[in-house]
């Protein structure tokens, strides 16, 4: 249940377990080098919590050569949720290492819970590949830039592609395709989203394993060979109705099945 305290403005931001000060907020402004994860909390629980903690720890080790204790992260999330007076929320955990610091500074941001995506999505392909795409990090100018251009052109999101029209990922989502028998993920450098990973795990558990294959905009591996497609992120799943001029059928039965698979993934108390 959401019981936001009216005297606590949202977003509610804490740094290392205390309300953000002006000095704290200079950290993300002046030292953008960092990483984050975004999650949806419902009744104090999170799907894939262990995956989020592992993501933060792996990125922290790679960027700062420091481990990140999962119990500390959970404690800070709980503290920020209590501070905001919410048990249903959108939560973002950012990790930074300001100059001279020996311990990672954690910024926890709490907002109202996000609604699941509504309606089928139209994607505009763009020639953009992220550096170190396996790390989820703030300040992605290219993704934001192309996302805005896609919106101006009447699309819902940008679809990132590598040289040769190789499909990698959505600007803020992972993309999956349906070949009539199984889910296919692009075999290309991309962020392994938590929702995508949960779907992979749960489909495998259900005896319907997904696959990785090269996917391109055109040619024998082109998107047009697939009857349906979908995107997913921490907010949920949504069907794709077109990529550029290639139309896809909205397979309601497929989306119900995938939604049920995702909803069946275990939830963990923060």
PLM regions and their residue ranges:
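Helix-start/capping segments and mature chain N-termini
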Residues: 1-79, 96, 101-270
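Phosphate/pyrophosphate-binding loops at sites that engage ATP/ADP/AMP, CoA/4′-phosphopantetheine
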Residues: 80-85
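Ordered, amphipathic secondary-structure segments that act as subunit-interaction surfaces
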Residues: 86-95
